[in-house]
Design a protein with these regions (language model features):
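Anionic-ligand binding region
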Residues: 108-111, 118-143, 149-162
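Hydrophobic anchor at the start of a short beta-strand
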Residues: 35-37, 86-87, 109, 136-138, ...
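Conserved nucleotide-binding/hydrolysis micro-motifs of P-loop NTPases
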Residues: 43-45, 117, 144-148, 173-174
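Inter-lobe coupling/hinge region of RecA-like P-loop helicase motors
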Residues: 175-198
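Beta-strand-loop-alpha "switch" segments that mediate conformational coupling across diverse proteins
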Residues: 145, 155-183
Length: 211
């Protein structure tokens, strides 16, 4: 029986929105279930550096550096040929022909955003590129603090872009501590982070299948 790869692109034009944080945590969650590869197409290589610091005995997704369109194209083709179940693409924060091509390959595009004025002001260009790809897509709220005024206002603002909010990662110390240590925030004993990451992974797959 053949296995169809689920290709999830994590994309935003704005740096600092938590794009790699979302990509790494989705890849970790799916790696617990099935073969998973994280294609690191961001020139900063944050996901690649994260894997280098990861404990050798920890269950991990395969992380493949993809410097440029041809490398990403080869890696994605190979992942599909080898029937890797989950393929997460961490895309660079800019617009280019490479981005358009990779977005078009996605089964689902997730757009991380923080509930801040700076993020929301710059999100239109990201959304325009996502809509142009004609792929399923939605927002992930990152570093979310529900008690803040901005958090209460973000729902109506994002609704104007005709994309659903798929899920949330909270503003937790565990996430900022985990990545520099080669870990996920949910691997540091934070039970709320554990629940949050697995819930997000399930919601992303539901969106992939049902949107």
């Amino acid at each position: 029986m053949t296995t169809e790869s689920s290709v999830i692109c994590v994309f935003s034009n704005k740096g600092g929105c938590g794009k790699t944080t979302v990509a790494v945590h989705l890849a970790l969650a799916y790696a617990r279930l099935e073969r998973t590869v994280l294609l690191d197409a961001d020139p900063q290589g944050t996901a690649t550096e994260w894997l280098k610091r990861r404990p050798a005995d920890a269950k991990s997704p395969l992380v493949v550096p993809c410097p440029g369109r041809e490398a990403a194209q080869r890696a994605l083709k190979l992942a599909r040929e080898e029937q890797v179940k989950f393929v997460i693409l961490d895309l660079p924060p800019h617009s280019s022909a490479q981005i358009a091509w990779l977005l078009a390959e996605a089964d689902l595009i997730v757009v991380p955003t923080r509930p801040t004025a700076a993020d929301l002001v710059t999100i239109k260009q990201t959304v325009d590129l996502v809509h142009a790809s004609k792929r399923k897509a939605g927002f992930i709220l990152n570093a979310f603090r529900p008690q803040l005024v901005e958090a209460k206002e973000i729902g109506p603002i994002l609704a104007g872009y005709s994309l659903p909010i798929i899920g949330v990662l909270g503003d937790r110390v565990a996430y900022s501590r985990g990545l520099p240590a080669g870990l996920g925030g949910h691997e540091l004993g934070d039970e709320q982070a554990q629940e949050e990451v697995m819930k997000l992974a399930k919601k992303v797959m539901t969106a992939r299948n049902e949107l």
